[in-house]
Amino acid sequence: MRTGMWFDSGRVCLDLLATDGPEGAGSGCREGTRDGLRDGLRDGLSDGDALRLWLVGAGLVPDQTPLGRLGPDWVEAFRSLRHDVGTLVRAELAGTGPEEEALARVNAAAAGPPPGVCAVRNQEGHLVRELCGGVECAGMLATVARDAVELLTDPGDLALIRSCEGDGCARLYLDTSRGRRRRWCSSELCGNRERVARHRRRVREVAGT
């Protein structure tokens, strides 16, 4: 799995949003100006190799599925879908209603046929999942767009969407924890940072007394 990628939102479409820019919406690496960087923030879908790793990590492409070179057209298509899904999800959370052009584009992507799945035997004789007919960009986009449509039209899941409380983190996730008490995208990352920051504040307060 590529460093900085995150697959714990509870929805594939929210995992896609997590590749966008600042930590919690992407990798969070501030570096110079190179390909894949926007305003000094690393884009989690910086190139075809990054997109390939995301597709596998998100479970959209079964392990061992041969993936050819994913060109700039793939990257641009997924970035565009990410932007539109993010626009729609945040509009719903803010209660401002859908942005019609973004909605039309997501609906158009969702209307395409998703890739077919079949069971084949591997070299050990076990049945494994495989995509039938190869991996096509439109099919991959349709899978993510359909997940977004399902989320946007499900009041129950919409009510579970939370934004990470970590400082500088904008990741969105479904809070399915007991009592709906989840505060961070990751207890090990943002949660641990918050605990460390809290400890440092206490130390400074004690030192100042």
Features from the language model and the residues they span:
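Residues immediately within or flanking Cys/His clusters that coordinate Zn2+
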Residues: 161-166, 182, 187, 193
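Basic DNA-binding region of bZIP-type proteins
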Residues: 188-206
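Short helix-coil boundary/hinge micro-motifs
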Residues: 1-163, 170, 207-209
